[in-house]
Amino acid sequence: MVAPAGTGGRAARRGPHVPSPYSQAVTMPESPAVNGPASPPPLPAGASSAGRSPTDPASRLAADPATQGAARSLTAAGPYRPGEVVVHRSFTTKRLVFVRTGHVVGHDERGLRLWIPHGCPMAVELSADGRGLRDMPFAEWIRQPTVMTTTVWRGPNIFMLVPPQGANSVWWFWDWQGRFVRWYINLEEPAVAWRHDGLVGVDTTDHDLDLWVTPERTWEWKDEHELEERLAFPEHYWVPDPDAVRSEGERLLRLVEAGAFPFDGTWTDFRPDPSWQTPDALPAGWDRPRA
């Protein structure tokens, strides 16, 4: 069991309290298949902003011993081309549980950048009565027959950075007026990129513990209770080393508190290419075996 306040019994470092994200602007639904907001007006059209940080992120990552041995296989299927349609998939070990469709924004030494728009086709694992993982206790969920259900993403637009190293991805969120409002640090298994029969994708496993970060760089852990609850069922849970997950979050928080890339304002003014068309349905092969 993880120590409630930190790794190995250490007190957790906590920033000032972060108010409920988007309390005045946009709802971030806990279950992506239900209760999403109504379709928003599109973000203002314009050229993508991919300004480079004054601190070279590739050098920073390479110099950080916490990232050694965590190199992702993003180059194996790359380089990805801007505008390509991509499926971003989450697994619990080998079982597919979540898929969203988006576009490649860019792919270079800083990592793979994706745009996941509101309204994109997606699939999510649900119980036979239409409930999701977060709609019931984990002890009940693991006894449920489930099915992958296709729907659309009702949450907000997401700009996502999958870095070349590290067990995480960083997400940018804007309100419906196009104002940057949050970073989200998603702690996850190092991603694997792939190409198969003309389809491109990125596969990972969510590690459940996450972080919200405001533009002022205050921060707050998210979903600690879910991690704690699920660790009581090791034969069913997909996070083998919760201490390593928290340590990865703490590593990212050092960058947050230093105002270093990617938390230095890079891409906060991003706008998607207006020529990108959201697909009407998930592409063929979206449910292929894990790469």
Outline where the language-model segments fall.
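Charge-rich, low-complexity N-terminal segments
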Residues: 24-36, 40-155
